């Protein structure tokens, strides 16, 4: 296997320091050499990490920034040598890299037109996917371009029920199984803490001294960054309505000039909203997973919908959130 050296200066923290909410944990820097895995092997590793709640970003068969961070974080959490080498047993956890998905009649009901203007969107009851490609890519945590690459020659505008598609063999984000409503507290996770690293673009959850999961995020922007400090989750909702207020989004000032946008995968906050005790700030999903970790947001902590759907089952209302 051909090797290249990709020196990754990734801040993996001291677990003990991470358990303390009063200080920003000091970084540990690990220079990591990663093998140049072929596309299928990289995909298998992405699937393994994703299924283990160490999100590598969108699955695309490439060794990108979040693939590296997820791999080192997983090794850190499981007391493994922090190198880029991968033991064969990791790959053995994903014996089948790809699977098939058959387009269903009900899938087509999840697709529709979404007007570009927020005033028009506010008149709707649901903001659906705008294409079957987006539906399938999000279901399998993948880049749209990768799904297209795996299915050459497919006419995505005219796919019919019964057609079969090749997709990564990852645990799917089954959008139809999520019902609008509040997320209850989970006493079992009352001691867990959420750390939002605005420099590495990561959300990490700790249970006492144990790293539980890591997901890539977009944490605010230069003009309206995620608020540094210690906060708490006040409440959480699945398929939330979103109060679109440009004053709040751009300047952090609530106004009466707003639109209530209905829920759906094309809602700006996606499948989940977890509100913090900081007005207008929350942890939420997105209508554009392709941009996670790269494009800016409006002060909030944004995840891909497939990661947001999982984070609600890994934390609890009332948990401490430390943004640094």
What is the predicted role of each segment?
Residues 4-12:
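Sec-dependent N-terminal signal peptides
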Residues 17-19:
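Boundary at the C-terminal end of the N-terminal hydrophobic targeting segment
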Residues 36-69, 103-141:
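Primarily a LysM-type cell-wall glycan-binding module
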Residues 40-43, 47, 65-76, 88, ...:
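Solvent-exposed, polar/charged alpha-helical surfaces in well-ordered, non-transmembrane soluble domains
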Residues 50-58, 74-82, 94, 136, ...:
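Sec/Tat-exported extracytoplasmic proteins
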Residues 65-110, 146-182:
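Extracellular LysM carbohydrate-binding repeats and other cell-envelope/extracellular binding modules
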Residues 143, 154-230, 235-240:
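Cell wall/extracellular polymer interaction/catalysis modules
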Residues 154, 251-324:
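Exported/periplasmic cell-wall-interacting domains
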